[in-house]
């Protein structure tokens, strides 16, 4: 496999509705941003780019079949090769990794990955119905299943087994909204308190409206390349491009229905799901105690796909201790509860300790005043962009939005793009992006690193 670099990215402004632009025009907004950051015109880029990968979640939201080819044509990239990917909420993350594969395999030297969603064409209730179609339509959907209900069920089990509290979940919401306050591309730039989150309208107990991501219109685009492609881009732009290398990718899957997921024995958990930083006598004993008391993995409250994706990505990137070796994470926080669950499955803390980790301060930015009394200093900021909860969740763009913000963090250009360096992770050298579908059916994890 060849080295792969993520050299540029652009995003549109995320909003509840963007009636000013069609979905191809939103993609062009992000595409133009990415090219401008490279110092290239469309004509120059067209001579260099080999093809693209497109990402959008739902034909229903787009109100258009084959919407990706319309965006490809609008960008002026025909007849270059392209294909569309779809994987629920993980669609953008899959798109990024498909572009990586095109470069790593030698099929392309320069590949554009772009994604979009326009969710404002329908009322929120209808949008929730469309999203619910990404569950089992033979069993779950007909009896009124919807995603906020699924996640409420998962977190109540997590609360029962591990003592996780609604206040710990609210810490995630406060953190992500306060981060988004400093992100000019974010949809919800609000300053919140724990009380604000808990007193918001209840959607599905214990999840309030401020525990849940928002529907959005938006687009994002990234440019990935090989060493040869990088040389072509630099020659055309006449400038050196800061190197950000994609050093690891991982994916995982699980059954659509949570009840269909097997409960692993202690030995099988150690064999298949133990992360590298967990292979210590102390942590093995901790897990043995959980199993002795009747706990199982993944249960209905954990994401085995996320653990598998993390394990694969860490293996490729040579990461032994994610909390110590990763400088920031852009994580798929569709719900505050799912961010807590994902802390555990990415190895930022142990299985069952996500709630305490959320309220500890370790996932917070050191440069933001959250108005909270936090016991620990920041260790690995999670969702410095504001995440899905506050920055927005235009599904097909979301995983690519994470990649764009990660690229800017590692190029140390957050201050340039945001006109405010509050959210710049100091001396960031390595970041992770995490994209998640369904109740953990598809998950991607990618590791990006600054290369001098």
Q: Locations of the language-model features?
A:
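Conserved catalytic cysteine-centered active-site region
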Residues: 1, 56-114, 118-150, 188-214, ...
């Amino acid at each position: 496999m060849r080295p792969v670099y993520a050299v540029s990215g652009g995003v549109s402004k995320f909003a509840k509705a963007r009636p000013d632009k069609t979905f191809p025009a939103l993609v062009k907004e992000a595409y133009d941003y990415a090219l401008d950051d490279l110092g290239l015109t469309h004509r120059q880029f067209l001579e260099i780019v080999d093809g693209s990968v497109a990402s959008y979640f739902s034909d229903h939201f787009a109100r258009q079949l084959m919407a990706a080819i319309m965006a490809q044509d609008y960008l002026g990239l025909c007849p270059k090769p392209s294909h569309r990917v779809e994987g629920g909420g993980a669609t953008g993350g899959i798109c990024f990794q498909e572009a990586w594969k095109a470069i790593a395999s030698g099929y392309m030297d320069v590949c554009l990955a772009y994604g979009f969603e326009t969710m404002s064409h329908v009322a929120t209730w209808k949008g929730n119905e469309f999203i619910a179609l990404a569950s089992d339509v033979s069993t779950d959907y007909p009896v009124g299943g919807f995603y906020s209900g699924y996640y409420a069920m998962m977190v109540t089990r997590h609360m029962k087994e591990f003592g996780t509290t609604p206040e710990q979940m609210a810490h995630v919401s406060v953190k992500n909204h306060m981060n988004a306050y400093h992100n000019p591309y974010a949809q919800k730039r609000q300053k919140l308190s724990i009380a604000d989150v808990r007193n918001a309208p209840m959607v599905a107990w214990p999840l309030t409206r401020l525990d849940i991501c928002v529907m959005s219109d938006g687009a994002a685009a990234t440019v990935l390349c090989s060493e040869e492609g990088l040389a072509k881009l630099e020659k055309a732009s006449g400038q050196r491009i800061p190197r950000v290398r994609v050093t690891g990718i991982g994916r995982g899957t699980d059954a659509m229905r949570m009840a269909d997921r097997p409960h692993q024995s202690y030995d099988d958990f150690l064999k298949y799901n133990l992360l590298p930083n967990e292979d210590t006598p102390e942590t093995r004993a901790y897990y043995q105690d959980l199993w002795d008391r009747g706990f199982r993995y993944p249960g209905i409250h954990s994401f085995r796909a996320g653990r598998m994706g993390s394990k694969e990505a860490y293996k490729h990137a040579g990461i032994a201790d994610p909390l110590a070796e990763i400088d920031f994470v852009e994580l798929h926080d569709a719900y505050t509860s799912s961010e807590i669950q994902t802390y555990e499955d990415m190895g930022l803390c142990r299985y069952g300790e996500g709630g305490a980790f959320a309220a500890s301060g370790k996932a917070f930015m050191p440069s933001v005043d959250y108005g909270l009394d936090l016991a620990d200093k920041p260790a690995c900021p999670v969702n410095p962009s504001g995440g899905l909860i506050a920055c927005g969740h235009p599904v097909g763009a979301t995983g690519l939005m994470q990649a764009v913000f990660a690229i800017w963090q590692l190029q140390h250009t957050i201050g340039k793009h945001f006109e405010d360096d509050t959210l710049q992770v100091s001396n960031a050298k390595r970041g992770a992006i995490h994209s998640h579908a369904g109740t953990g059916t598809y998950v991607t994890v990618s590791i990006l690193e600054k290369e001098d």
